[in-house]
């Protein structure tokens, strides 16, 4: 599986994303012509060296004075450009995310009345259209982003002095569920435009996924920093058998909870969205019998599941083991009909495939097979075997 991984150790801006993707192999001539045909700008692309790292610097030359554009006006510019459908959809999606972020910050529910200042200029339009075209041209199966260095300090903008990250940028970080951190540089390293492009295309990662590097690209930023002001991107070939997924593991010890309470908690955690739950017997200090409760969850479900564990068990706290990058097979549920003792029954079967569609495993749904076993008098193990055989004939 081919993946694009952005590594924003010096932040990200629209022109840095554009430069990075062009350096990775997107067609420079095609993207440049597309930008200049869509927006009243000229584009210069050149190689520079930033603190010892060669990078691609993209300069968008715009008219000296431009009017502030509204959200509908920006959409009109994109639609009038006659872009390829995938590029147009991405550009509109990015501006939609920007609009929602600005609306949330300013308390303006009517997007039609939103005025864009910095992100409404032609250079931002060019960055968004160009980055969308370049990313699509790389033909990746997926796009990811490692933790983002947002910078620190304050910035001056149309609404006055704002903290870093700017409020709209922070909303976009929230929307994309990105990991981010401050830095020693007293500058804005992640711009709203950069954040919006990443939020549209990329999923969050805490660290690089397992895979092999195909190519590396660097997009140059404008400012001179203490380190290289570049956005690093890599095209990687991930393990074709598996698909990346982000999880967190919750864990706590419970030494004064009955089996009935633990059984109920087990069911409720699964109903609330836990990916898996394990309750293990343990011995604590002074020989007290206890249980270790472990829960696998998506990051967005961690807080509510942790609260549920505390409320139900009386535990004083829940450990959240640092987010892990796991690899899993793509799974789907199918129904199959099969014969048992002359009678036709139906059962769900879980089918696992890799990203290339190769069958990895089939597993009959236990609860369905248990009901069939009770009705037919056949051992549940035999019922499961028959269900899986029927599934193999249909889906192999």
Curated annotation (Swiss-Prot):
Gene Ontology terms for molecular function: lyase activity; nickel cation binding
Is Metal-binding given among the entry's keywords?
no
Q: Tell me which UniProt keywords the record has, alphabetically.
A: Nickel
Record's Pfam families?
Ni_insertion (PF01969)
Report whether Transcription shows up as a keyword of the record.
Answer: no
* Family statement drawn from the similarity comment of this UniProt entry: Belongs to the LarC family.
Q: Which PANTHER family match?
A: NICKEL INSERTION PROTEIN-RELATED, PYRIDINIUM-3,5-BISTHIOCARBOXYLIC ACID MONONUCLEOTIDE NICKEL INSERTION PROTEIN
| Name used for this protein in its record | Putative nickel insertion protein
Report the source organism.
Methanosarcina barkeri (strain Fusaro / DSM 804)
């Amino acid at each position: 599986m081919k993946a694009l991984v952005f590594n924003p150790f010096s932040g990200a801006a629209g022109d840095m994303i554009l430069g990075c993707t062009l350096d990775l192999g997107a067609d420079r001539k095609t993207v440049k012509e597309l930008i200049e045909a869509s927006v009243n700008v000229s584009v210069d692309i050149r190689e520079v060296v930033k603190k010892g790292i060669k990078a691609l610097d993209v300069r968008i030359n715009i008219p000296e004075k431009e009017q502030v554009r509204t959200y509908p006006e920006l959409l009109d510019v994109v639609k009038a450009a006659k872009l390829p459908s995938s590029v147009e959809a991405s550009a509109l999606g990015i501006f939609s995310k920007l609009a929602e972020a600005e609306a949330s910050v300013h308390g303006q529910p009517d997007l039609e009345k939103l005025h864009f200042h910095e992100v409404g200029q032609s250079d931002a339009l060019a960055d968004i259209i160009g980055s969308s075209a370049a990313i699509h041209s790389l033909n990746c199966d997926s796009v990811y982003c490692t933790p983002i260095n947002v910078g620190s300090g304050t910035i001056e903008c149309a609404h006055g002095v704002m903290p870093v990250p700017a409020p709209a940028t922070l909303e976009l970080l929230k929307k994309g569920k990105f990991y981010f951190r401050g830095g020693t540089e007293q500058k804005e390293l992640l711009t709203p435009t950069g954040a919006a492009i990443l939020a549209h295309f990329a999923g969050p990662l805490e660290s690089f996924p397992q895979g092999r590097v195909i190519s590396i690209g660097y997009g140059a930023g404008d400012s001179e920093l203490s380190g290289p002001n570049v956005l690093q991107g890599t095209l990687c070939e991930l393990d074709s058998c598996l698909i990346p997924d982000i999880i967190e593991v919750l864990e706590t010890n419970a030494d004064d909870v009955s089996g009935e309470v633990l059984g109920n908690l087990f069911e409720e955690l699964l109903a609330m969205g836990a990916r898996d739950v394990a309750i293990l017997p343990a011995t604590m200090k002074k020989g007290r019998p206890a249980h270790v409760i472990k829960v696998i969850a998506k990051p967005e479900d961690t807080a509510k599941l942790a609260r549920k564990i505390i409320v139900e068990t009386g535990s004083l706290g829940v450990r959240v083991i640092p987010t892990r990058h796991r690899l899993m097979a793509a799974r789907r549920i199918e129904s199959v009909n099969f014969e048992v003792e002359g009678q036709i029954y139906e059962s769900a079967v879980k089918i696992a495939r890799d990203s290339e569609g190769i069958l990895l495993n089939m597993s009959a749904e236990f609860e369905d097979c248990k009901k069939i076993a009770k009705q037919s008098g056949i051992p549940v193990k035999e019922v499961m075997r028959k269900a899986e055989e029927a599934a193999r004939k249909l889906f192999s």
